[in-house]
Amino acid sequence: MELLVIIITLALIFDYINGFHDAANSIATIVSTKVLTPFQAVIWAAFFNFVAFFIAKCIIGGFGIANTVSKTVVEQYISLPFILSGVIAAIVWNLFTWWKGIPSSSSHTLIGGFAGAAIMAHGFDAIQLNIILKIAVFIFLAPFIGMVVAFGFTLLVLHICRRAHPNTAEMWFKKLQLVSSALFSIGHGLNDSQKVMGIIAAALIAAHSEGLGMGINSINDLPDWVAFSCFTAISLGTMSGGWKIVKTMGTKITKVTPLEGVVAETAGAFTLYLTEYLKIPVSTTHTITGAIIGVGATKRLSAVRWGITRSLMTAWVLTIPVSGILAAVIYGVVTLF
């Protein structure tokens, strides 16, 4: 029972860290265009992170991404020690990339840690390879979708607004950026909170198989406090902010105007809602980065700082294997006690 409580606590801590680690995804463009101050922006994003709970519960009527994450590992192999190892590895990698100002994926960190510890514990038979491969494909597909949608949407908006006075257009797009930022924050809450829900669900299922009182038989029995806690934790984390990554996302990839901020956030939100519909966990970091690149590419390819982009992509590719290896090492240490 104590181990289960520790895992749930650490998972919610990870969710909180995810909030301030990924806060930049929702607010970087709205801060860089000076529509809101950093403080105002994190409050705005945190509020809509939590609104996502009610959308998932009352409108969507379920938590499909949480179900996908909980099934990353074959149910018969799920155990509390390797879940603990995966969560610890995810926290360590997330804090390291936050400290370095690298916008890596909290989502893939968590899934990589979960899978890596499972492989260390039971071998490759323990993981659902089809789910892992689907998630891996969307490491590249999600930012590509965001980039293509943003590129096309930017050209469309520029054509529609070609006769508008620049000052009038900027005023309207600054107002619209409040809406686009809110839409993206809802997508962030929907996507990222459910990943932690999936891990907690797996822990509760493992607890049930071990005869512990708090356990559940399947994710369909997941109590409401799990979802409420996860959405609350990510909202509180978002309020804490992540200013190093805000700078990278908002200014280092490409300079962003209010019009471009609206387009990038709208394209990013579209991608997140699409993957929510498909029940595939994706990275909000990858998604908004792809959208920002798509916006920058409409000016000219040289407007995108490809050196920064390459370093981001390297971090993305390394996230799952590094967090997986780290989780495997931690599991080896945990089993010594």
What annotation goes with each model-predicted range?
Residues M1-F337:
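Multi-pass alpha-helical transmembrane bundle typical of ion/small-solute transporters
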